[in-house]
């Protein structure tokens, strides 16, 4: 990454890079073929991450986290992003949404996540409500001091089966100048709670060892004490997490793109055809030039967004531009890398084919490329009254 960093940030990047090389990369092919990370492997990664201070680095020191700023977290995510989410999930972070916990909830949910005793999941996507969050069908009906939840969530991603879910459900309707609008609230629901079931989702061609789950709620009764924040605050709570999630996706895409570029450069310098390295052919060398240029541009967008977040100035448009460009950039670089490697680029002996498959998901989750373009264009046109 050819970007000016402080000495502390450079040390962080080097430290995470070593962790990835020594602890994660050697397991990559094994977990890809197994379709999941074993409990033993996951515990070893998590314990090493805790020892090195990476785990929960995004949360404040006041709750036992690392207290890193967003720029440092982007640097960290960029390095961790070079490997499968299935592996780096064990070394990363609980969601910042848990900072909305009250004192009782902190001891039950937040603090165990900080120490690695528990793992949460974020459940907002539904079979009929992906990008259109407000069309969610999951409902929570008030019943005295309880809420009764009915509905389902899918594409709930996690490196392991979660201990509890942060579930978003409609709890009523508000009248707004634009008409009725669903009031969305968040609930903390434990695995095994009556009326709540977690099952494995279908296997995905991308991020094969990164698990996805289906969450089903059938008259699931939870108390007021299980609500995260206040009623109707669900989308407000989720907004910051979603925005920063797009920056983390962008950072991870840059990490994988750098890995693809390095592999392609090495291959182009050593693979010979017609008595010369294929990197000497213009078709290959121009691909490499484009790859390096696009990666640099994406890196700058990611760091720009992260630094604005540190200053409290990041907008939804900043996050959307970051996620859009970086994910589309990774798609192009992955395709170039396969082409440069030829037939070997599609063989499991090399990581190229996995990185190529994994790249496809980045343009879909955390908001599709089309949604990002909608956010960006809306910010451009609305000031003009369009």
Predicted regions and their residues:
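Short Ser/Thr-interspersed hydrophobic loop/turn segments at strand-loop and sheet-helix junctions
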Residues: 53, 76-80, 101, 169-171, ...
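Flexible, small-/acidic-enriched active-site or ligand-binding loops
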Residues: 135, 192-223
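A short, Trp-centered hydrophobic/proline-enriched beta-strand micro-motif
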Residues: 116-124, 168
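A short core secondary-structure module
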Residues: 137, 150-198
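Short Gly/Pro-enriched turn/cap motifs at secondary-structure boundaries
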Residues: 113, 128-131, 155-158, 177-178, ...
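Helix-loop "lid/cap" segments that line or gate small-molecule binding pockets
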Residues: 93-101
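Alpha-helical interface subdomain recognition
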Residues: 1-88, 100-105, 112-117, 130-133, ...
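Short beta-turn/strand-loop junction motif enriched in small, turn-promoting residues
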Residues: 62-64, 126-129, 145, 153-155, ...
């Amino acid at each position: 990454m050819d970007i000016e960093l402080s000495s502390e940030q450079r040390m962080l990047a080097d430290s995470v890079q070593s962790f990835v090389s020594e602890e994660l990369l050697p397991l990559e092919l094994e977990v890809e073929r197994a379709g999941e990370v074993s409990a033993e492997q996951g515990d070893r990664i998590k314990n090493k991450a805790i020892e090195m201070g990476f785990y929960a680095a995004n949360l404040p020191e006041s709750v036992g986290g690392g207290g890193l700023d967003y720029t440092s977290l982007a640097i960290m995510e960029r390095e961790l992003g070079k490997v499968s989410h299935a592996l780096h999930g064990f070394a990363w972070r609980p969601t910042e949404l848990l900072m909305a916990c009250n004192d009782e909830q902190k001891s039950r949910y937040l603090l165990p996540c900080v120490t690695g005793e528990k793992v949460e999941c974020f459940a907002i996507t539904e079979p009929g409500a992906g990008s259109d969050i407000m069309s969610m069908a999951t409902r929570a009906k008030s019943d005295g001091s309880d809420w009764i939840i009915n509905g389902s969530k899918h594409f709930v991603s996690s490196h392991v089966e979660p201990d509890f879910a942060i579930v978003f459900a409609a709890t009523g309707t508000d009248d707004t100048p634009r008409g009725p609008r669903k009031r969305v609230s968040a609930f903390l629901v434990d695995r095994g709670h009556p009326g709540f079931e977690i099952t494995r989702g279908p296997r995905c061609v991308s991020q094969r060892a990164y698990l996805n789950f289906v969450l089903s709620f059938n008259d699931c009764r939870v108390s007021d004490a299980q609500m995260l924040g206040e009623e109707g605050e669900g989308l407000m709570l989720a907004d910051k997490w979603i925005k920063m999630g797009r920056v983390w996706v962008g950072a991870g895409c840059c990490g994988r793109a750098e890995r693809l570029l390095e592999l392609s450069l090495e291959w182009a310098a050593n693979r010979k055809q017609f008595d010369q390295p294929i990197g000497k052919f213009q078709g290959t060398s121009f691909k490499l030039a484009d790859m390096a240029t696009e990666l640099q541009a994406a890196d700058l967008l990611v760091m720009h967004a992260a630094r604005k977040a540190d200053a409290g100035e990041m907008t939804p448009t900043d996050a959307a531009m970051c996620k859009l460009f970086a994910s589309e950039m990774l798609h192009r670089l992955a395709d170039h890398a396969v082409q440069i490697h030829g037939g070997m680029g599609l063989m499991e002996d090399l990581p190229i084919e996995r990185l190529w498959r994994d790249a496809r998901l980045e343009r879909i989750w955390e908001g599709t490329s089309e949604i990002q373009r909608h956010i960006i264009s809306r910010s451009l046109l609305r000031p003009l009254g369009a």
